[in-house]
């Protein structure tokens, strides 16, 4: 009896662990991130992420970036100088190979390209960064990113910064 119970427990443990391993691959997420970029920039990203094996992922994203300036008349940032200084929006794709794995977390490089506009001309961008994700209950995840964007034909050629976000399971 004891031997059968022991074999049953081992079988259940293997079944449950394989189910959890299967749950972490081929999962889709809707991501939302907000960040601050040097110098005087804010960034918001809405993306769809398809996770493949071993936490590698493909991300399809929409990105908006706003750069504010001091109002020359007031001497500080005003509503007008914040919202109407410089704005870009991009649509792009990023491949995210996993480089760090842990029990409830993993880290990915983020390599991507995008194209968009700054409301006056077409711009292109190359994206490189690191993203670290922490798993929560029910498939929810939170993450932070360190990002570097190289923008072609934009007002600011290099953007670097940090973003925080959440991943909602689909």
What annotation goes with each model-predicted range?
Residues 93, 157-170:
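Outer-membrane beta-barrel "beta-signal"
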Residues 21-66, 167-169:
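Short glycine/proline- and aromatic-enriched beta-strand/turn motifs that initiate or cap beta-hairpins
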Residues 8-10, 145, 160:
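Generic detector of N-terminal low-structure segments
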Residues 32-45, 85-87, 115-126, 150-159:
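Solvent-exposed loop/turn segments connecting transmembrane beta-strands
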Residues 64, 146-149:
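Generic short beta-strand segments
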Residues 49-129, 134-142, 168:
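Gram-negative (and chloroplast) outer-membrane scaffold detector with strong preference
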Residues 27-32, 75-78, 113, 146-147:
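Extracytoplasmic loops and strand-loop junctions of Gram-negative outer membrane beta-barrel proteins
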Residues 1-26, 170:
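Cleavable N-terminal export/targeting peptides
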């Amino acid at each position: 009896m004891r031997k059968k119970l022991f074999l049953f427990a081992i079988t259940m443990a293997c079944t449950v662990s394989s189910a959890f391993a299967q749950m972490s691959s081929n999962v889709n997420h809707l991501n939302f991130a907000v960040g601050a970029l040097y110098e005087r920039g804010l960034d918001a990203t809405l993306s769809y992420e398809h996770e493949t094996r071993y936490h590698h992922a493909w991300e399809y994203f929409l990105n908006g970036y706003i750069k504010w300036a001091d109002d020359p008349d007031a001497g500080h940032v005003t509503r007008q100088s914040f919202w109407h200084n410089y704005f870009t929006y991009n649509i792009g794709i990023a491949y995210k190979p996993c480089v760090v794995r842990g029990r409830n977390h993993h880290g990915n490089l983020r390599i991507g390209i995008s194209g968009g506009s700054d409301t006056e001309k077409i711009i292109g961008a190359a994206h490189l960064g690191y993203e670290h994700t922490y798993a929560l209950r029910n498939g929810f995840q939170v993450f932070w990113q360190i990002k570097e964007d190289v923008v072609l034909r934009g007002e600011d050629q290099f953007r670097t910064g940090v973003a925080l976000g959440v991943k909602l399971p689909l």
